[in-house]
């Protein structure tokens, strides 16, 4: 199962069809285990996109919650959260991700968690800045005078007005998540075989560039 249709099983092996060249039967050929490369590319795209979506969903949600509270209320909590985000940003992203993965282990869930943690600070800063800008706007002051509760002000009156800015950062984050997941899987610390990922497929195929170049070119 996945986001895209696959004509063959992505894990079924066939010694008789090992390194079959591209044909009408196998559009992108087969790999060293006789698996259909087209099916695995489709599955790899599905895996990478799904992981990237969940990374952005997790980090974006946490970024909204932390950024909204710290940006609106300020104070000690704001200071603590900002110092934590500064500390996270102080480490190279790939290094911090490697540390988290080394503690948690490889696998889809841990990749999502590791990348999600690394991506949170960027969303916190964007949301915090927008909430700080809007918390003293005239319409927010009028809402307070009318007795509107803080939670409603945060998530009904302010949050919808930052989505134009937040959406742009989400798109950038999604692209970065795709690159990060592919890089991690290529290095062998992301999605584990036999699950297909664009990164681990490229890593497996590079050794056959001379004998079966379609494995890499696909």
Which residues does each predicted region cover?
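Generic hydrophobic transmembrane alpha-helix motif, especially the helices
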Residues: 27, 31, 62, 71-72, ...
């Amino acid at each position: 199962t996945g986001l895209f249709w696959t004509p063959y099983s992505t894990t079924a092996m066939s010694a008789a069809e090992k390194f079959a060249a591209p044909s009408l039967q196998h559009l992108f050929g087969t790999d060293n285990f006789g698996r259909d490369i087209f099916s695995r590319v489709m599955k790899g795209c599905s895996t990478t996109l799904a992981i990237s979506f969940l990374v952005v969903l997790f980090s974006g949600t946490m970024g909204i919650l932390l950024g909204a509270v710290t940006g609106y209320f300020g104070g000690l909590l704001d200071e603590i959260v900002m110092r934590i985000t500064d500390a996270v940003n102080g480490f190279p992203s790939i290094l911090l991700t490697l540390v988290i993965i080394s503690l948690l282990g490889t696998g889809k869930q841990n990749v999502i968690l590791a990348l999600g943690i690394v991506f949170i600070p960027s969303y916190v800063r964007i949301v915090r800045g927008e909430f700080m800008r809007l918390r003293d706007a005239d319409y927010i002051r009028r809402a307070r005078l009318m007795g509107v509760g803080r939670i409603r002000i945060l998530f009904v009156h302010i949050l919808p007005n930052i989505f134009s800015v937040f959406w742009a950062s989400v798109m950038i984050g999604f692209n970065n998540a795709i690159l990060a997941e592919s890089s991690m899987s290529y290095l062998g610390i992301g999605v584990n075989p036999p699950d297909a990922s664009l990164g681990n497929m490229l890593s497996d195929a590079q050794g056959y560039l001379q004998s079966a170049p379609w494995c890499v070119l696909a």
